[in-house]
Regions:
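Single conserved hydrophobic/aromatic residue that forms the stacking wall/gate
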Residues: 1-12
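Non-catalytic terminal/accessory segments
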Residues: 13-191
Length: 191
């Protein structure tokens, strides 16, 4: 009696220029996997229209904006370049963004009784790790939003030390001048 293993076999995406090619590949992939007693997870497998013509094709059919997809913690979508051309872009996926915020918030509240210098030092290590993974082209807005939320959590955590308020917002900003938080930057330019 062999127990079936569950989990991620592989996470990958394929791109095709024509819908017929994608449908043919999808059918062949299912058939090929069946030979090895494997199957695709239907809820996680789909064909989407994605590319420079997706917006105008969907608009012509009255379907609205092009679909997006999530892959490795990023949401892939089509936006516009500075010159107005359709351009593939990425941003941190909402689920991963919120999950990391909860983790950072929990850590900050657990560490709030340490000296401010130590908290900021450890926080910077964590922030740089986050930036190094999510620091890609077109994602600076989400990185800046993440830093802003972390600053708010840090302010609240610092004010929950003891019975009285430790910092006003201006005092907190002054403290950050002495112990600055790591700023987001693009580590991996994609284009």
């Amino acid at each position: 009696d062999v127990e079936r293993s569950r989990g991620l076999g592989d996470v990958y995406k394929r791109q095709f220029q024509y819908k017929s090619d994608a449908e043919h590949y999808y059918a062949a992939l299912k058939e090929r996997m069946a030979k090895f007693n494997l199957e695709l997870e239907e809820s996680k497998s789909r064909l989407i229209e994605f590319g420079r013509y997706a917006e105008q094709n969907r608009r012509a059919r009255g379907l609205g904006k092009p679909e997006t997809f999530e892959f490795l913690g990023f949401t892939f979508y089509y936006g516009k370049s500075r010159k107005g051309y359709p351009w593939p872009k990425v941003k941190t996926s909402r689920k991963k963004f919120e999950k990391k915020l909860r983790e950072f918030k929990e850590w900050l509240y657990d560490s709030k009784n340490q000296p401010a210098k130590d908290i900021v030092k450890q926080l910077n290590v964590k922030l740089v790790g986050y930036y190094r993974y999510y620091g890609v082209s077109f994602n600076v807005y989400k990185l800046s939003a993440f830093l802003h939320r972390i600053q708010q959590f840090l302010f609240k955590a610092m004010n929950r030390r003891g019975c009285r308020r430790t910092y006003t917002w201006n005092g907190f900003i002054d403290m950050l001048k002495y112990y600055p938080l790591a700023k987001p930057k693009v580590y991996y330019p994609l284009y």
